[in-house]
UniProtKB/Swiss-Prot annotation:
<feature type="binding site">
    <location>
        <position position="240"/>
    </location>
    <ligand>
        <name>NAD(+)</name>
    </ligand>
</feature>
<dbReference type="GO" id="GO:0006730">
    <property type="term" value="P:one-carbon metabolic process"/>
</dbReference>
<comment type="subunit">
    <text>Homotetramer.</text>
</comment>
<dbReference type="InterPro" id="IPR042172">
    <property type="entry name" value="Adenosylhomocyst_ase-like_sf"/>
</dbReference>
<dbReference type="GO" id="GO:0033353">
    <property type="term" value="P:S-adenosylmethionine cycle"/>
</dbReference>
<dbReference type="GO" id="GO:0005829">
    <property type="term" value="C:cytosol"/>
</dbReference>
<feature type="binding site">
    <location>
        <position position="327"/>
    </location>
    <ligand>
        <name>NAD(+)</name>
    </ligand>
</feature>
<dbReference type="InterPro" id="IPR015878">
    <property type="entry name" value="Ado_hCys_hydrolase_NAD-bd"/>
</dbReference>
<feature type="binding site">
    <location>
        <position position="239"/>
    </location>
    <ligand>
        <name>substrate</name>
    </ligand>
</feature>
<dbReference type="GO" id="GO:0004013">
    <property type="term" value="F:adenosylhomocysteinase activity"/>
</dbReference>
<dbReference type="InterPro" id="IPR036291">
    <property type="entry name" value="NAD(P)-bd_dom_sf"/>
</dbReference>
<dbReference type="InterPro" id="IPR020082">
    <property type="entry name" value="S-Ado-L-homoCys_hydrolase_CS"/>
</dbReference>
<dbReference type="Pfam" id="PF05221">
    <property type="entry name" value="AdoHcyase"/>
</dbReference>
<keyword id="KW-0520">NAD</keyword>
<protein>
    <recommendedName>
        <fullName>Adenosylhomocysteinase</fullName>
        <ecNumber>3.13.2.1</ecNumber>
    </recommendedName>
</protein>
<dbReference type="Pfam" id="PF00670">
    <property type="entry name" value="AdoHcyase_NAD"/>
</dbReference>
<comment type="pathway">
    <text>Amino-acid biosynthesis; L-homocysteine biosynthesis; L-homocysteine from S-adenosyl-L-homocysteine: step 1/1.</text>
</comment>
Length: 485
């Protein structure tokens, strides 16, 4: 693949769409800083002591303006950083340009091919002589996956001389991963094992990536400690819920200009992301229907006045379909064939396998009409009617809009900084084994507290008598570990 790394005048590596967009990115970054009090508080509290001095951090997370503030928080605390996006459509090119010019090595641009995406991921992990990163900030688990698959292939190659065969899988993306690893064996047959030996740990941002980590922990194949940032309350109950409540209608309207009021909208899944999406559509005037497998989540939806049906019940009646499950094969091509003309189909889960894009793309005689970037009308030959698919089945709020707003991302990214600090500060203590951990409650509460002042909140304080009565410390933590917010 004919891609090459470029360098700034200071020698920093990068590959972005257009470095001349850096000034624009810097202006938006400065606006975002005001809306991200948690990250700015981290700079104030930890910056003087430079706790990340000597640390190499690789990040695979949407290269947005908000992520730019996270990156510059990590560098302000002393880290060296290399970054790529975790989605081919989610990068904001002006944000990538600003960071590449001013702060860190970035390999990201909006509209990457899958080959380019994995090239960027490989570059993000490549620190040259001396192995890879000390720490990983991951979103969806692709950087973690590449290292695990690389180590597995190197061990097999050393034992038997066998190299990965890209044709051994039907998954087109995994073919690319195996090709990268196979080609890497020719130049360095221990590259990923050297990365593994150096790695202190990973902090994972999203539900999908966390599932991967727990699967590896269960199978005994997890190679390094991991902190599950997603299940911090100040992440899942804010980013996943309120972030999606904001960004789903933003993406829908930017992509289609459709009026949501009066439409029938189907939300597949009613976890935190699904709850935010359903609330947004309901507030916009849609008649919302939810599909669910979990009776508890289904009952929650019913208590909100939302009908629970199967996709088959409503596929020919609804106007908007949103997948939020984190699972595969939710909306299949046979469902899409039965939809009404110009029904909108989109996904706000991390990967592109919730909607059967392969089945749609290979359907005999189907015609794809690109209306604008990330907005395509697919016309079926039998009916001459079509559906509108957003962001090619990938994250529509980042593919068709700019994702979640800065304030809610400050909550998530403050958790990331704290998780990275926790891993780095405890690297020699043995506190963290090759398992998945969640940040303790007092740190979760600290993240929330850092964001209250921006909104003008004033907390009530327990008296000593009240504290003794309910056996809760005056300064917290205020809830038990299993409390459900």
């Amino acid at each position: 693949m004919a891609l090459s790394v470029e360098k700034t005048s200071s020698g920093r590596e990068y590959k972005v769409k257009d470095l001349f967009q850096a000034d624009f990115g810097r202006l938006e970054l400065e606006l975002a800083e005001v809306e991200m009090p948690g990250l700015m508080a981290c700079r104030t509290e930890f910056g003087p002591s430079q706790p990340f001095k000597g640390a190499r951090i690789s990040g695979s997370l949407h290269m947005t303006i908000q992520t730019a503030v996270l990156i510059e928080t990590l560098t302000a605390l002393g880290a060296e950083v290399r970054w790529c996006s975790c989605n081919i459509f989610s990068s904001q090119d002006h944000a990538a340009a600003a960071i590449a010019r001013d702060s860190a090595a970035v390999f990201a641009w909006k509209g990457e091919t899958l080959e380019e995406y994995w090239w960027c991921t490989e570059r993000c992990l490549d620190w040259g002589v001396g192995g890879g990163p000390d720490l990983i900030v991951d979103d969806g688990g692709d950087a973690t996956l590449l290292i695990h698959e690389g180590v597995k292939a190197e061990e097999e190659f050393e034992k038997s001389g066998k190299v990965p065969d890209p044709e051994s899988t039907d998954n087109p993306e995994f073919k690319i991963v195996l090709t990268i690893i196979r080609d890497g064996l020719k130049t360095d047959a221990s590259k990923y094992r050297k990365m593994k030996e150096r790695l202190v740990g990973v902090s994972e941002e999203t539900t999908t990536g966390v599932k991967r980590l727990y699967q590896m922990q269960e199978s005994g194949t997890l190679l390094f400690p991991a902190i599950n940032v997603n299940d911090s309350v100040t992440k899942s109950k804010f980013d996943n819920l309120y972030g999606c409540r904001h960004s789903l209608p933003d993406g829908l309207m930017r992509a289609t200009d459709v009026m949501i009021a009066g439409k029938v909208a189907v939300v597949c899944g009613y976890g935190d992301v699904g709850k935010g999406c359903a609330a947004a559509l309901k507030q916009a005037g849609a008649r919302v229907i939810v599909t669910e497998i979990d009776p508890i989540c289904a009952l929650q939806a019913l208590m909100e006045g939302i009908q629970i049906l199967t996709l088959e019940d409503v596929v020919s009646e609804a106007d908007i379909f949103v997948t939020t499950t984190g699972n595969k094969d939710i909306i299949m091509v046979d469902h899409m064939r039965k939809m009404k003309n110009n029904a909108i189909v989109c996904n706000i889960g991390h990967f592109d396998n919730e909607i059967d894009m392969n089945g749609l793309e290979t359907y005999p005689g189907v015609k794809r009409i690109t209306i604008k970037p990330q907005t395509d009308r697919w016309v079926f030959p039998e009916t001459k009617t079509g559906i509108i698919v957003l962001a090619e089945g990938r994250l529509m709020n980042l593919g068709c809009a700019t994702g979640h707003p800065s304030f809610v991302m400050s909550c998530s990214f403050t958790n990331q900084v704290i998780a990275q600090l926790e891993l780095w500060n405890e690297k020699a203590s043995g506190k963290y084994e090759k398992k998945v951990y969640v940040l303790p409650k007092h740190l979760d509460e600290k993240v929330a507290a850092l964001h209250l002042g921006k909104l003008g909140a004033r907390l009530t304080k327990l008296t000593k008598s009240q504290s003794d009565y309910i056996s809760i410390p005056i300064e917290g933590p205020y809830k038990l570990r299993l409390y459900r917010y």
